[in-house]
Amino acid sequence: MFHKGLNKEVLIEASKELVEENGIAAFSMRALAEKLGVKTASLYAHVASMDTLFTEVGLSALHDQKVAQLAAIEGKDGDAAVFALAESYRTFAKAHAALYQLIMQMPMGKDETLRAAAAMTAEPSMQVLQGYSIGEERRMHWQRVLRGVMHGFVSQEASGYFSHYPVDLEESYRLAIQCVIDGLHKEAAQNER
């Protein structure tokens, strides 16, 4: 039996809201049903399981993150684009901490849909790296480095690891991204010789 107005997209959006409000650990199909004012069993007409729903929620969050990053880098290139991407990445991770955590827990290598999504998330990074004189394969390496630096920083920041020192966090993040940019310039200069 289908509840009027209930569909997979409604479930995904309501699930994202619940995850953001209460965290991943507190999420349940029962809580989702209560939020939507339906019986828990009616949810399974739209999704096979909670794992399937979490995959869909993660994919939606990945899409949201990608859209935010592409908007941030629009009209920018070179170093300005890298800094804009990095700021967008960090802003998303802080504003949507539980969804970001869900994204990072998705087993990207085990499912073709998830692997395609992982490739999709590399798109903004690959786009900003086109502004440097490095080959396609090296760009793949550099986007991993850039994403690794951004993720490492926001993960440690979220865990409170940076709260022990009275130095400006913004400057620390800027410095981390500048190190990546310096490496890009060094490699690009070597390629231009």
Model-derived segments and their meaning:
Residues 8-13, 20, 25-26, 37, ...:
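An amphipathic alpha-helix adjacent to DNA-recognition modules
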Residues 19, 53-61, 103, 107, ...:
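Alpha-helical DNA-contacting segments of helix-turn-helix folds
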Residues 102, 148-166, 182-190:
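Amphipathic C-terminal alpha-helical segment
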Residues 56, 70-99, 110, 134-136, ...:
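Hydrophobic alpha-helical connector segments
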Residues 92-112, 155-163:
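Amphipathic alpha-helical segments used for helix-helix packing
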Residues 108-136, 140-145, 155, 171-182:
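Amphipathic alpha-helical packing segments from all-alpha helical-bundle domains
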Residues 1-6, 188-193:
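N-terminal intrinsically disordered/low-complexity leader segments
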Residues 30-34, 43:
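Append "Primarily bacterial transcriptional regulators
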